[in-house]
């Protein structure tokens, strides 16, 4: 429930020669009104007649058939009406995009919303759908439509952990929230401005009953971080797997983007494992017992518990047909990489070792809408999740209980997720290994040398984070909801802001692209690992353009300026309040041109009290304006690509010569972990 509150934010500034800044934009009244109306659609979708009951009359008077001419995609309107006539997924049932029939219905609903010719038609359709389709399907289709419609560009969705808190918080805290909503006010309550506030401690899985045979539970603070899981939810909205690129004017990079983003997430997880004295992510075999168990303590909104997977469990017999399908798809994809081509749906050979080859490969591995032959190469990604998640299915239509791996919001919580993508990324590495290594000419920047790299002291800590739970419980009335605020308080990993100080010498005035990576210095046994054998485990931290002048250049880049990160989401109640006061003209409303990104708090692994060694690698490369491509993403905002591969130069096996070039520099850093009370800083 939205409650009017006020909050302020401090934005830090730092100096850089040329920064790809993320500017804030000033919203006009139309934007503010639309953003406010959209926000309201996400709240209490399971009780649409109770929350904002005035929308009920709007829904009753809207008729899809009478508005047929107000949609560009009339086929979608007609198909949706047929689905509705013959029975769609009922309200109250569990929804997952990884179920074929549910996915089809959600896609048709999205097409209906997306093709509305005007915002008013879109909004009226969304209001109508809020009362008439499955709640979770509605939230998914509405989210994708808001992100991709031109007239809602850069409008924010409420944080999904406040829209669907049952998918981000354990059942223990949700049960306490239910009790409060039902009148149990035994917990501490504070009243301010006639609003009753409840603050509930939220723990991570395993705090009560630790599974000693699941060492990955030590990482729950990372894998269950609500900001990280919200990031992954949004990642899958940038290029929804079901969409065709040309239908929404996507740039032809989604396959490469799929590999790169999952590589980033996997490498970040590995860095966190090292902070906890754990080694590389292990592979998982479908033909042997699965060593990593998963014991979620979460429930779906209708009360069904998430499936669990026992430690050492084997794939059940009824899933064996899918295991064989996975083996077949693996063979076909691996063979295609070796042969250098895939076969499209017309029987034509599509070469892989071309400029678009990696994109083609990523599309067939994911099995997305751009796959050249989904019948031959299938949907390996979804199939492996289905088998390893141990979700429940029955022969009764719509009776499914998806696993954590089968929900975008919960995928990262299961440690097997990272084993899955370690295997999937083997296709990426195999492909890259078959390419020629970078030559000295491709890596060098003549006349430019990095003289030194220093980084501020790196300090991490856990601090409190509060998140609203109201939307996960039933409300008695709109008025009661307005006067109640239930929040979960949780410890989350954070770090002090830090700055890279890079001194670069140039013999001329020239533009350069700076890339910064963070990777392991030692393995879990304390053995030093060299870059040549460990290049694939580095996470890219940042990239930005600089104008180098002739002579010495001091570049300073703050951690919060990274093109990959964003600060924590503004709480829903705070943002809604800003919209309310902006709509009446009392204040100006500003919004970011980069709506989403990786959580800035999680840039650094936890480290250790005495300091955990890692390597920072800095590369300065020539920047040629003629090769620049600007890509506008509805999720990540505008980014500049200089024509090089994502993750360059660590996307390919590293030649030892990389380390002797003057425009490449490796620096050891220590990441120190502190208790919050140890920090001599005002937080």
Swiss-Prot record:
Q: Mainly localized where?
A: secreted
What's an example of a GO molecular-function annotation for this chain?
A: nutrient reservoir activity
What are the glycosylated positions? 203
Q: Name one GO cellular component term.
A: nucleus
Q: Name the UniProt key words of this record, in alphabetical order.
A: Cytoplasm, Glycoprotein, Nucleus, Secreted, Signal, Storage protein
Tissues of expression: Expressed in the fat body and secreted into the hemolymph (at protein level). Present in trophocytes and oenocytes of the fat body (at protein level).
Q: Which residue ranges does the record assign to the Hemocyanin N-terminal domain?
A: 32-153
Tell me which InterPro entries the record gives: Di-copper_centre_dom_sf (IPR008922), Hemocyanin/hexamerin (IPR013788), Hemocyanin/hexamerin_mid_dom (IPR000896), Hemocyanin_C (IPR005203), Hemocyanin_C_sf (IPR037020), Hemocyanin_N (IPR005204), Hemocyanin_N_sf (IPR036697), Ig_E-set (IPR014756)
The segment(s) forming the Hemocyanin C-terminal domain are 437-673
What the protein does comes down to: Storage protein that may function as a nutrient supply to compensate for lack of dietary proteins during metamorphosis and egg production.
Protein family according to the UniProt entry = Belongs to the hemocyanin/hexamerin family.
Q: What is this protein called?
A: Hexamerin 70b
Source species taxonomy: Eukaryota, Metazoa, Ecdysozoa, Arthropoda, Hexapoda
């Amino acid at each position: 429930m939205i409650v009017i509150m006020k909050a302020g934010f401090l934005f830090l500034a730092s100096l850089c020669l040329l920064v790809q800044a993320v500017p804030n934009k000033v919203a006009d009244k139309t934007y503010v009104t639309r953003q406010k109306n959209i926000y309201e659609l996400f709240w209490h979708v399971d009780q649409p007649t109770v929350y904002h009951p005035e929308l009920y009359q709007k829904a009753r008077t809207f008729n899809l058939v009478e508005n047929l001419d107000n949609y560009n995609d009339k086929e979608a309107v007609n198909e949706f009406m047929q689905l509705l006539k013959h029975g769609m997924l009922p309200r109250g049932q569990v929804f997952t995009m990884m179920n074929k029939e549910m996915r089809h219905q959600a896609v048709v609903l999205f097409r209906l919303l997306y093709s509305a010719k005007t915002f008013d038609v879109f909004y009226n359709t969304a209001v109508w759908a809020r009362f008439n389709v499955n709640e979770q399907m509605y939230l998914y289709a509405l989210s994708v439509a808001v992100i991709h419609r031109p007239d809602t560009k850069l409008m924010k969705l409420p944080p999904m952990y406040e829209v669907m808190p049952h998918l981000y918080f354990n059942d223990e805290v949700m049960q306490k929230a239910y009790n409060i909503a039902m009148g149990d006010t035994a917990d501490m309550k504070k009243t301010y401005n006639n609003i009753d506030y409840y603050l509930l401690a939220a723990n991570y899985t395993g705090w009560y009953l630790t599974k000693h045979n699941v060492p990955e539970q030590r990482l729950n603070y990372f894998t269950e971080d609500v900001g990280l899981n919200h990031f992954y939810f949004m990642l899958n909205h940038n290029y929804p797997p079901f969409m065709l690129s040309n239908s929404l004017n996507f740039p032809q990079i989604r396959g490469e983007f799929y590999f790169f983003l999952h590589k980033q997430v996997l490498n970040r997880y590995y860095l966190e494992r090292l902070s906890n004295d754990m080694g590389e992510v292990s592979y998982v075999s479908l033909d042997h017992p699965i060593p990593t168990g998963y014991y979620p303590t979460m429930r779906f909104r209708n009360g069904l518990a998430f499936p669990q997977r026992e430690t050492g469990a084997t794939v059940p017999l009824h899933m064996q047909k899918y295991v064989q399908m996975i083996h077949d798809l693996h063979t076909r994809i691996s063979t295609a990489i070796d042969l250098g081509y895939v076969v499209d749906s017309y029987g034509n050979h599509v070469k892989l070792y071309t400029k678009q080859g990696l994109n083609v490969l990523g599309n067939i591995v994911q099995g997305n809408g751009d796959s050249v032959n989904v019948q031959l190469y299938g949907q390996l990604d979804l199939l492996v999740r289905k088998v390893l998640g141990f979700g429940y299915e029955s022969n009764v239509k719509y009776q499914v209980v998806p696993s954590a791996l089968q929900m975008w919001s919960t995928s990262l919580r299961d440690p097997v997720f990272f084993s899955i993508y370690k295997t999937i990324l083997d296709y990426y590495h195999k492909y890259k290994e078959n390419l020629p290594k970078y030559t000295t000419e491709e890596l060098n920047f003549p006349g430019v040398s990095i003289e030194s790299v220093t980084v501020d002291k790196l300090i991490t800590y856990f601090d409190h984070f509060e998140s609203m739970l109201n939307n996960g419980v039933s409300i008695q009335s709109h008025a009661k909801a307005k006067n109640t605020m239930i929040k979960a308080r949780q410890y989350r990993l954070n770090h002090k802001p830090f700055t890279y100080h890079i001194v670069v010498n140039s013999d001329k005035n020239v533009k350069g692209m700076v890339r910064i990576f963070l990777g392991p210095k030692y393995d879990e046994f304390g053995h030093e690992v060299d870059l040549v054998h460990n290049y694939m485990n580095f996470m890219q931290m940042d990239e930005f353009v600089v104008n180098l002048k002739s002579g010495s250049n001091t570049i300073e880049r703050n951690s919060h300026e990274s093109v990959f990160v964003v600060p924590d989401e503004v709480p829903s109640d705070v943002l809604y309040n800003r919209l309310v006061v902006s709509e009446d003209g009392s204040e100006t409303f500003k919004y970011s041109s980069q709506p989403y990104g990786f959580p800035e708090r999680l840039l650094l692994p936890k480290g250790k009290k005495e300091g955990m060694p890692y390597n920072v690698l800095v590369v300065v490369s020539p920047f040629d304006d003629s090769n620049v491509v600007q890509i506008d993403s509805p999720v990540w905002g505008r980014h500049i690509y200089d024509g090089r591969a994502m993750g360059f130069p660590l996307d390919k096996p590293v030649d030892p010569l990389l380390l002797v070039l003057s425009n490449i520099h490796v620096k050891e850093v220590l990441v120190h972990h502190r208790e919050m009370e140890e920090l001599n800083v005002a937080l």
